Amino acid sequence: MKKTGILNSHLAKLADDLGHTDRVCIGDLGLPVPNGIPKIDLSLTSGIPSFQEVLDIYLENILVEKVILAEEIKEANPDQLSRLLAKLDNSVSIEYVSHNHLKQMTQDVKAVIRTGENTPYSNIILQSGVII
């Protein structure tokens, strides 16, 4: 049995299979998942697990070169945004798009990870970097 890192087998496989520029979305309870895109549903109840908890684990285990966020998070959820930005390396590029555009972009991710997060615009697309 694995004792460190990502223990959820679906999340671990997703992280292990990422190549350079592959994208994964971590979303809140309300984010729709396009047909044909795998959904890894971690939600247990409203708020559990939180967006930040899931983001922390992923950032510990994958190299991220870019993140994509909804522009609306700046006004609708500034606390979530400031906590999120504090976790990113200075080398990580940050792109803001409209929430509708972010939802369209989920059509090109490897998977959407659904959290129990119940605050607005708590969605992020992580673009994988490369270690060489």
Curated annotation (Swiss-Prot):
NCBIfam families: PRK11797.1. Substrate binds at D28, H99, Y121, S122, N123. This is D-ribose pyranase. Catalyzes the interconversion of beta-pyran and beta-furan forms of D-ribose. Its main location: cytoplasm. InterPro entries: D-ribose_pyranase, RbsD-like_sf, RbsD_FucU. One of its GO terms (molecular function) is monosaccharide binding. The keyword Transcription does not apply. It comes from Streptococcus agalactiae serotype V (strain ATCC BAA-611 / 2603 V/R). It comes from the Bacteria. One of its GO terms (biological process) is D-ribose catabolic process. The gene is rbsD.
